[in-house]
């Protein structure tokens, strides 16, 4: 990833505090730098979403990485992400070693689809390691704002590697009738298995279930839930991939992309306003919107995260990559703005439904 001019969609936050959660995990608490003007809605977020951080790199200029927000929009005043070192992870190690109070970091607006549709329901949360970060946001929000009960099954290597151990004890003491935390320690029980997780999850199989953690854990947890009878539409999984391109770079749309058909027309409804925009055939919908200064949601710009999903009302598009939308999503008309190019002469989409 090379250093390119930053787009107008890029925000700059300041690290107010770095909290050592465990020997290999840090929470970065952010604030808006003094004198900076960032509209409040640019930082508005939902529990389960993430921030994309621009991490400096001597080799490539910078790398972009997504980190879940462990703060809750209901209970916390400041955005917080929690980062755990990974063996070969440049960005996580750099942040754990170098992040400090006063440091400024470029970020993208909070994004992501790993979000409960309704906090007034019962939840089953399955997390391993740093997968606890979005679960903390969901858990705190559900308990403070919702009315349902929460069961958290949380796997770690040992007691010393449990991120948020103290905070979870405090929440359990505050909500003894609504929060149940079940710890799985590899030093005691071995690696989590589908059978073991299934035994713990079976009494709660009908709940909205959220899964986040390393790949093998998520596979075991998903298998456990399906075996226990949890409906597919109740299973929600968060997967992060390293980004290859630079989502922070400014977008440049060519006036003429050389297509004999000429540009298509995009009719886009966003935040209550409908825009009619020239759409070159080779350009991605998201890039066209950003080029016009529209604040369309996105994160990875690579078809992996689903943050840019938008509802297509009419017309046809082609998506180069789709790693996140299910067949049912496609049937409903959802498309990925970062991957969609026009097939028909006119395409109508809305972000407001």
From Swiss-Prot:
Induction context: Induced by KstR.
Cofactor(s) the protein requires to work: FAD; [2Fe-2S] cluster
GO BP annotation list: cholesterol metabolic process; lipid catabolic process; steroid biosynthetic process
EC number of the protein: 1.14.15.30
Cofactor note: Binds 1 FAD per subunit. Binds 1 2Fe-2S cluster.
Pathway linked to the protein: Lipid metabolism; steroid biosynthesis
Keywords: 2Fe-2S, Cholesterol metabolism, FAD, Flavoprotein, Iron, Iron-sulfur, Lipid degradation, Lipid metabolism, Metal-binding, Oxidoreductase, Steroid metabolism, Sterol metabolism
Biological role: Involved in the degradation of cholesterol. Catalyzes the introduction of a 9a-hydroxyl moiety into 1,4-androstadiene-3,17-dione (ADD) to yield the 9alpha-hydroxy-1,4-androstadiene-3,17-dione (9OHADD) intermediate which spontaneously form 3-hydroxy-9,10-seconandrost-1,3,5(10)-triene-9,17-dione (HSA) via the meta-cleavage of ring B with concomitant aromatization of ring A.
Subunit and partners: Monomer. The two-component system 3-ketosteroid-9-alpha-monooxygenase is composed of an oxygenase component KshA and a reductase component KshB.
Record-given protein name: 3-ketosteroid-9-alpha-monooxygenase, ferredoxin reductase component
């Amino acid at each position: 990833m090379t250093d390119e001019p930053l787009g107008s969609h890029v925000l700059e936050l300041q690290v107010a505090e770095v909290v050592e959660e465990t020997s290999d995990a840090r929470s970065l608490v952010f604030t808006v730098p003094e004198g900076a003007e960032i509209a409040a809605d640019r930082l508005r977020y939902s529990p389960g979403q993430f921030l994309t951080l621009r991490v400096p790199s001597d080799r490539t200029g910078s790398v972009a990485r997504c980190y879940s927000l462990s703060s809750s929009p209901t209970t916390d005043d400041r955005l917080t992400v929690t980062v755990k070192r990974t063996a070969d992870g440049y960005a996580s190690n750099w942040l754990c070693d170098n992040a400090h109070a006063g440091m400024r970091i470029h970020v993208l607006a909070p994004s992501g689809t790993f979000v409960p549709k309704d906090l007034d329901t019962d939840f089953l949360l399955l997390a391993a390691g740093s997968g606890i970060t979005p679960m903390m946001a969901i858990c705190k929000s559900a308990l403070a704002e919702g009315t349902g009960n929460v069961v958290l099954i949380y796997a770690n290597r040992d007691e010393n590697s449990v991120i948020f151990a103290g905070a979870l004890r405090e929440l359990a003491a505050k909500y003894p009738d609504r929060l149940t935390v079940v710890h799985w320690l590899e030093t005691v029980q071995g690696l989590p298995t589908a059978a073991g997780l299934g035994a713990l999850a079976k009494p709660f199989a009908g709940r909205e279930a959220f899964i986040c953690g390393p790949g093998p854990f998520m596979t075991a947890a998903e298998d456990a839930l399906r075996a226990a009878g949890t409906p597919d539409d109740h299973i929600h999984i968060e997967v992060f991939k390293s980004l290859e391109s630079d989502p922070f770079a400014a977008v440049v749309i060519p006036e003429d992309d050389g297509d004999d058909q000429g540009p298509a027309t995009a009719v886009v409804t966003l935040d209550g306003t409908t825009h009619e925009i020239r759409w070159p055939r080779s350009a991605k919908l998201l890039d066209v919107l950003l080029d016009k200064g529209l604040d369309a949601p996105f994160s990875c710009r690579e078809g992996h995260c689903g943050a840019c999903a938008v509802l297509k009302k009419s017309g046809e598009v082609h998506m180069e990559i789709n790693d996140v939308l299910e067949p049912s999503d496609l049937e409903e008309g959802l498309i990925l703005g970062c991957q969609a190019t026009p097939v028909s002469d006119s395409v109508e989409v809305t972000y407001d439904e």
